[in-house]
Amino acid sequence: MKLISWFKILCGMLLVFFYHHAYALYISADISSMESGEPFFSKPYINDTKKTNLYTFSVYQIDRPGYQEQGTPIQNGEILFTPLKKILLPGEQEFFKIFYRGEADEKERYYKIIISETPLDIRNDEGQKKQPLFYPTVSLETYFVVRPKDPDFKYDLTINQGILKNTGNTYFRVLLHQNCDGDDDSEPYVFYLLPNQQIKDLRISQKSRK
């Protein structure tokens, strides 16, 4: 299963962990997000396997991403999405859409999307009727964020202590390079900070590109 843009995160399980006790969110790829005033969010996904696959989708709300996240069912049609399930032939493409019908205020909202892929093999044995053969289902997860009505990107940086705090009302991504050389091709250290979260890391206090 190949998922374009934010669905690339589904090539493997989403890696989410916290660095010591800093309560900063680390993930292996981008978080999907939309502005609260947008009518819907849409991304294509492609079945790049050699089998016909059944894809099923589910979404629920969480307090915030992380190991101790608390999930709750979607209330009052706040989130609508389509399709609920879809069978794709090898190489076939479909669009997954999310419609946000909740409040447009200064609160950032977080959701977890679960996409399950089940190979479905149709065979015809010795002239008998075609029988569907199911294989184990693989479920993959990613996060979806609805930003506040008026996103406020603010932070507090205490360089001598190596502390970075998100003082705004929406998450942002941070990239730390090992040095300030513009030609440095080394992989940057990437993490995300949610509102009111902070991280303490020696790399922040070092002379580097941020």
Residue ranges and their predicted role:
Residues R101-P151, K207-K210:
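Terminal connector regions
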Residues K43-T49, G162-T170:
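Asparagine-centered strand-capping/turn motif at beta-strand->loop junctions
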Residues M1-K8:
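Positively charged n-region of N-terminal signal peptides that target proteins for export
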Residues K8-F18:
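Bacterial N-terminal signal peptides
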Residues Q70-E103, D183-S208:
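Intrinsically disordered, low-complexity Pro/Gly/Ser/Thr-rich segments with frequent PxxP/GP/PP motifs
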Residues A24-T49, K85, D150-L157, V190:
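Beta-sheet-dominated interaction scaffolds and their linkers
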Residues K50-I74, S116, N169-D185:
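Short acidic, flexible loop segments centered on an aromatic residue
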Residues F18-A24:
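Sec/Tat signal peptide C-region and signal peptidase I cleavage site
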